[in-house]
Amino acid sequence: MTNLRKTHPLMKIINDAFIDLPTPSNISAWWNFGSLLGVCLVIQILTGLFLAMHYTSDTLTAFSSVAHICRDVNYGWLIRNLHANGASIFFICLFLHVGRGIYYGSYLFKETWNIGVILLLTVMATAFVGYVLPWGQMSFWGATVITNLLSAIPYIGTTLVEWIWGGFSVDKATLTRFFAFHFILPFIVTAMVIVHLLFLHETGSNNPSGLNPDADKIPFHPYYTIKDALGLLLMILLLLLLAMFSPDMLGDPDNFSPANPLNTPPHIKPEWYFLFAYAILRSIPNKLGGVLALLMSILILLVIPFLHTSKQRSLMFRPISQTLFWLLTADLFTLTWIGGQPVEQPFIIIGQVASILYFLIIIALMPLAGLLENYMLKPKW
């Protein structure tokens, strides 16, 4: 009799995705982040669900309800800290996952890559509306500043902003709808993750060499289930260390004060994982230009597959492109640092140079390096 795992309609899907999946034998730990992101999503949905049971989305009680969760609900402090820091771990894994995709040429699976970029945007939107919910000072002013960017859209901008706000300022209507969005978006993300996996399993995984791995594949279970379990253990350890010992390390001190529309914080800035995009936004002294640059900083990922000029898929054997990749990584760290600094010299000029370099590396330097490496591969005799 055939194994039920291979015949049952539902079990068969799980089996083909996580058990008998033919996987390249040489994929490194950089391929762990997909499963880690899946676990992050589950953690965020579960902790979020328990927080939603006690949270009230009203301007008068939102801040107090979060304090109530931390003080009076059994393990409420832990659930909240896991949720807040889980978001940071989520974004660390996301950035590493995207970085891996760029380094090893995984973007050449265009459908998988495109749905991945849309996923990244959706997760960023989810995190943004979620940050508004505790209704602290930075929550309120962050929401005000970022939603206000839409007013840069010609003709319809102001109307659009007031439509999103549900009034003439960020108020009760805004908070209520942001809570509704924050609740529904993770489930939309989950559906998109399934589509992401569906497209990935059409082609199979890429591998560090960038060569066709069909000749040498091994079953996902037990080889990669155990390998993913190690990564999972390390991620959970990092999350628990953060949540237990320094839960407020990545947050903003201004968010300990309830939202006050009459008092603007000295430095309005988003959570650390948006700072690179925020720095790009601020580096352009024109509102509409800044908004377009902000959008392009993420949407540029969609054009990367069309800018691939090399005969090799991966950067594994391409030292010039490797150098540019790590320069881009350093540039993103610089932008993240600048995004958290006040708007004054020398930070303004550093931010502008870093922003130009970001787009220059992706649009011009990497494709040129690919062509140069192709030329260097040609026999010269």
From Swiss-Prot:
Record organism: Perameles gunnii (Eastern barred bandicoot)
This protein's name: Cytochrome b
Biological process, per Gene Ontology: mitochondrial electron transport, ubiquinol to cytochrome c
Matches recorded under SUPFAM superfamilies: a domain/subunit of cytochrome bc1 complex (Ubiquinol-cytochrome c reductase), Transmembrane di-heme cytochromes
Sites where the protein binds a ubiquinone: H201
Keyword Transmembrane helix: yes
GO molecular function: metal ion binding; ubiquinol-cytochrome-c reductase activity
Annotated positions binding heme b b566: H97, H196
CC cofactor: heme b
Example of a GO cellular component annotation carried by this entry: mitochondrial inner membrane
